[in-house]
């Protein structure tokens, strides 16, 4: 019990020295906040919202872009323009650097990288299946690892296509599952190598 109390005290002392969490520089900018508030008030209710819905491309609707999201996106670039005009560094918004949408991809380069990584993983999975006999001791463990990894790349692609609270959590949870499964895979491999499993 005493060791647990000491650990809690150490954790509290360490946490007390941490600075308070703040929003990104761009989020705190009065110009950005006013722009978003005015845009949402003028465009995201009543007849203006209906007009937005009629003009919104199908691919943007399918990926969940709402009027308020569009306001944030446009105001982000208006604020970035002011920063550049004044000779300041471009700030982050909502914990991310400004991004250019392409079609329905919120972060096209990151989404493309995730797709390519997933594709490489899929190709290697098929090569592994073709080269390694099913009876091999690590076969199912390695196939499972490939499936966990493929799932992580799918969620990474989804997250970089459209950043929402759900897609962000799924991206991070699935990436963490790859790390955890890697540790498991190493332990199983070590056990088999030393014949202790």
Q: What are the functions of these language-model segments?
A:
Residues 3-197:
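Multi-pass alpha-helical transmembrane bundles in non-GPCR membrane proteins
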């Amino acid at each position: 019990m005493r060791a647990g109390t000491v650990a809690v005290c150490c954790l509290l002392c360490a946490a007390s020295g941490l600075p308070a969490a703040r929003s990104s520089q761009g989020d705190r900018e009065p110009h950005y906040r006013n722009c978003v508030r005015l845009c949402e008030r003028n465009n995201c209710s009543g007849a203006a919202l209906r007009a937005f819905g009629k003009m919104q491309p199908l691919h943007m609707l399918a990926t969940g872009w709402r009027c308020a999201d569009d306001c944030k996106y446009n105001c982000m670039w208006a604020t970035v323009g002011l920063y550049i005009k004044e000779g300041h560094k471009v700030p982050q918004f909502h914990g991310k650097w400004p991004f250019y949408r392409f079609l329905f991809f919120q972060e096209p380069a990151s989404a493309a990288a995730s797709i390519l990584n997933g594709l490489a993983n899929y190709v290697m999975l098929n090569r592994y299946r073709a080269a390694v006999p099913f009876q091999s001791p690590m076969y199912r463990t390695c196939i499972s690892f490939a499936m966990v990894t493929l799932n992580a790349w799918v969620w990474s692609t989804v997250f970089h296509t459209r950043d929402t609270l759900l897609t962000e959590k799924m991206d991070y949870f699935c990436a963490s599952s790859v790390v955890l499964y890697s540790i498991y895979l190493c332990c199983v491999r070590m056990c088999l190598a030393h014949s202790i499993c």
